[in-house]
UniProtKB/Swiss-Prot annotation:
Its EC number is 2.3.1.16. This is 3-ketoacyl-CoA thiolase. It comes from the Bacteria. Belongs to the thiolase-like superfamily. Thiolase family. PANTHER family: 3-KETOACYL-COA THIOLASE FADA, 3-KETOACYL-COA THIOLASE, PEROXISOMAL. GO terms for molecular function: acetyl-CoA C-acyltransferase activity. One of its GO terms (biological process) is fatty acid beta-oxidation. It comes from Citrobacter koseri (strain ATCC BAA-895 / CDC 4225-83 / SGSC4696). Pathway: Lipid metabolism; fatty acid beta-oxidation. The keyword Transferase applies.
Length: 389
């Protein structure tokens, strides 16, 4: 079976969904920009040699509809002979895109794939056109379709206080801002055209979603966003609404070596699981455990974790049940997470994996694990092993 390697991993800056940098930029353009950038950064790869493109996107309608993967590839002037498919596993879409490509390579059906994902939540809101089947209420609580209420449920089940949530959210912003200031994101962010507050065209090379002024004290004044009577989850402890894309160049190790391209990491294992929709945010726990089992590793073997921060109330129970509460500041989301950077649904799986790979290189780490919860009760995880140059 072929070894699957990540040769390159990049992303756009994360733009605010409400009047942000990409308010006049379409999702297809964000995607095409990264496809072109991957090829420009790796000139040894001919575009005609790409076997397939897998692109995650959740709200596949309006500008994100009609197979956005193919539309973006055509915009990027990738040869017409290269196919492309859009993948949807809700929040896990672009990580699923990675898994799909990896399996193609493992089985010998492909040698080279572009993967990634995009979501423009400013142009296509998360709830746009959603119409749940009435019969679902026979099997699933209606509140299970309301992500904030599932986070409230988890916080109550696991004893996660409002104070713990506020502290974690403040940490996310502080770490993301520190990473920005230190240049830690420089190798992953591709400068991307947008418009400033005055409508002037500008190249953005930083995440505009981060709020460096965030404090626990300020967060403590916010009202509950989903359960106004007894809730603890606020807008400040939830992932921000943002627009963005992320992408990776995935190859068989043999093809990468043949082209003289240095692999950055191998995919050691992959896992996806289902869980109770009412606690959808718990999915990373069984997904991570399954991925670790497949890799022949324990949580203690993992040097760095990237766990998508859908809500502080959601990620903290996952950290707790993976036995990592005492290691948060050494191992988990060292450059902040979705609370500070936002969670463009179809983009996030590739985004957290990209950030993880860069952190693994900076920290000289051997193993990293990226994982995320998925709406309606699923979890997805990937274990990466760094390839020494």
């Amino acid at each position: 079976m072929e070894q699957v390697v990540i040769v390159d991993a990049i992303r756009t800056p994360m733009g605010r969904s409400k009047g942000g940098a990409f308010r006049n930029v379409r999702a297809e353009d964000l995607s095409a920009h990264l496809m072109r950038s991957l090829l420009a950064r790796n000139p040894a790869l001919e575009a005609t040699a790409i076997d397939d493109i897998y692109w995650g996107c959740v709200q596949q309608t309006l500008e994100q509809g009609f197979n956005i993967a193919r539309n973006a590839a055509l915009l990027a002037e990738i040869p017409h002979s290269v196919p492309a498919v859009t993948v949807n596993r809700l929040c896990g879409s672009s990580m699923q895109a990675l898994h799909d490509a990896a399996r193609m390579i493992m089985t010998g059906d492909a040698q080279t794939c572009l993967i990634g994902g995009v979501e423009h939540m400013g142009h296509v809101p998360m709830s746009h056109g959603v119409d749940f089947h009435p019969g679902l209420s026979r099997n699933v609580a209606k509140a299970a379709g309301m992500m904030g209420l599932t986070a409230e449920m988890l916080s109550r089940m696991h004893g996660i206080s409002r104070e713990m949530q506020d502290a974690f959210a403040a940490r996310s912003h502080a770490r993301a801002w520190a990473a920005t200031q230190s240049g830690a994101f420089k190798n992953e962010i591709i400068p991307t055209g947008g418009h400033d507050a005055d409508g002037v065209l500008k190249q953005f090379s930083y995440d505009e979603v981060i709020r460096p002024e965030t404090t626990v004290e300020a967060l403590s004044t916010l009202r509950p966003a989903f359960d106004p009577v007894s809730g603890t989850v606020t807008a400040g402890t939830s992932s921000a609404l943002s627009d963005g894309a992320a992408a990776m160049l995935v190859m068989s190790e043999s093809r990468a070596r043949e082209l003289g391209l240095q692999p950055r990491a191998r995919i050691r294992s992959m896992a996806v699981v289902g869980c109770d929709p009412s606690i959808m945010g718990y999915g990373p726990v069984p997904a991570s455990k399954l991925a670790l089992k497949k890799a022949g590793l324990a949580a203690s073997d993992i040097d760095l974790f990237e766990m998508n921060e859908a809500f502080a109330a959601q990620i903290l129970p996952c950290i707790k049940d993976l036995g990592l509460m005492e290691q948060i500041d050494e191992k988990i989301n060292l450059n902040g997470g979705a609370i500070a950077l936002g969670h463009p649904l179809g983009c996030s799986g590739a985004r957290i994996s990209t950030t993880l790979l860069n952190l693994m290189e900076r920290k000289d780490a051997q193993f990293g694990l990226a994982t995320m919860c998925i709406g309606l009760g699923q979890g997805i995880a990937t274990v990466f092993e760094r390839v020494q140059s």
